[in-house]
């Protein structure tokens, strides 16, 4: 079985998220999504509209996702690749090069994001330009 993993906050779930998950799942047989915990979001200075359990429930309801695990810190990725016997590590292209250190353990792919949509864009359109 070919295992794929990706990471994210997945707040204000939108079609760009779904498209990324669909494309990631097409790269293997089993998709693991490491979802940022509320505590990790605080460390990253991010505020989510939905809490971890709500975001997890939404991700688990998506047919492309096989397993949702908590992402608790920056250094977790290498451990996850080994623990879950990951074949393909997928991130959005805005992270290009950041995870190349994993290439000796698995294939690393940076996917182009869906144009015209992002959580930040949604928040800014709803709440004004200062929203993040």
Curated annotation (Swiss-Prot):
Gene3D superfamilies registered for this protein in UniProt: HUPs
Reaction(s) catalysed (UniProt annotation): sn-glycerol 3-phosphate + CTP + H(+) = CDP-glycerol + diphosphate
Top EC category: transferase
Compartmental location: Cytoplasm
Binding sites annotated in the UniProt record for CTP: 9-10, 14-17, 46, 113-120
Coiled coil spans: none
Transmembrane residue ranges: none
EC numbers, comma separated: 2.7.7.39
InterPro entries per record: Archaeal_FAD_synthase, Cyt_trans-like, G3P_cytidylTrfase, Rossmann-like_a/b/a_fold
GO terms, molecular function: glycerol-3-phosphate cytidylyltransferase activity; metal ion binding
An annotated GO BP: teichoic acid biosynthetic process
Binding site for substrate: 44, 77
Segment forming the signal sequence: none
Record GO cellular component, one term: cytoplasm
Keywords linked to the UniProt accession: Cell wall biogenesis/degradation, Cytoplasm, Nucleotidyltransferase, Teichoic acid biosynthesis, Transferase
Pathway(s) the chain acts in: Cell wall biogenesis; poly(ribitol phosphate) teichoic acid biosynthesis
Domain of life assignment: Bacteria
UniProt cross-references to PANTHER family, sorted A to Z: FAD SYNTHASE (PTHR43793:SF1)
Family, as annotated: Belongs to the cytidylyltransferase family.
Function, in words: Catalyzes the transfer of the cytidylyl group of CTP to sn-glycerol 3-phosphate so the activated glycerol 3-phosphate can be used for teichoic acid synthesis, via incorporation into both the linkage unit by TarB and TarF.
Subunit: Homotetramer or homodimer.
Record protein name field: Glycerol-3-phosphate cytidylyltransferase
Species assigned in the record: Staphylococcus aureus (strain NCTC 8325 / PS 47)
